[in-house]
């Protein structure tokens, strides 16, 4: 959770991912201490909004320049054990407070694998060649695949819209032709009646 007055742009999310993944690659040692809530607050530790803490708290520090957090869930000895991180969502949880949710390690690998498979399947369905240039650059690949799938999604959406517009146009033309045909049939019947009399 963090304070910010608006949602993050894709560029800002990418910058955050890059910063975090750089820190992960540095393999910084985790500093975990248990202390009283007062001591933790004196050190500048940040408590999460709405969370309840006991008399003793676990304090996590993952490197200089980053916030010190009260934490009950990080169990890595060094940041390198995280492997890499990918943001999955960013939402507002209250006025001026945003929340980033992300996957790391195996979760990030699974997400990347699913995205690769989706990319290859979309290419197959569209009969276009798909290739993955550098599978070792997982985060870069993830972003590239995500951008490609978003682009394809927009194109497919546009194509669907174009088809729907054409269908609507044909329905309107059919309605007009039926009305015109009905008018001609009525006119022909009237003409036939006049001839018969």
State the predicted function of each range.
Residues 1-16:
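Catalytic palm subdomain of template-directed nucleic-acid polymerases
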Residues 6-8, 65-66, 108:
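Residues that cap or initiate secondary-structure elements
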Residues 10, 79-197:
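Terminal appendage regions of diverse proteins
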Residues 13-94, 162-197:
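Acidic/histidine-rich
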């Amino acid at each position: 959770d963090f304070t910010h007055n608006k949602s993050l742009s894709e560029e800002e999310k990418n910058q955050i991912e890059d910063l975090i993944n750089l820190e992960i690659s540095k393999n910084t040692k985790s500093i975990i201490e248990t202390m009283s809530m007062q001591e933790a607050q004196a050190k500048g530790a940040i408590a999460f909004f709405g969370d309840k803490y006991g008399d003793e708290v676990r304090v996590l520090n993952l490197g200089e320049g980053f916030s010190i957090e009260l934490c009950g869930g990080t169990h890595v000895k060094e940041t390198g054990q995280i492997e890499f991180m990918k943001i999955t969502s960013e939402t507002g949880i209250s006025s001026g407070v945003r929340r980033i949710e992300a996957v790391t390690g195996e979760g990030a690998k699974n997400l990347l694998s699913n995205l690769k498979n989706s990319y290859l399947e979309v290419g197959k369905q569209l009969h276009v060649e798909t290739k993955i240039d550098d599978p070792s650059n997982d985060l870069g690949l993830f972003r590239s695949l995500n951008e490609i799938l978003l682009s394809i999604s927009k194109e497919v959406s546009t194509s669907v819209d174009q088809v729907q517009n054409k269908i609507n146009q044909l329905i309107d033309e059919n309605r007009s032709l039926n009305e015109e045909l009905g008018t001609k049939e009525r006119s022909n019947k009237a003409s036939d009646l006049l001839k018969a009399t």
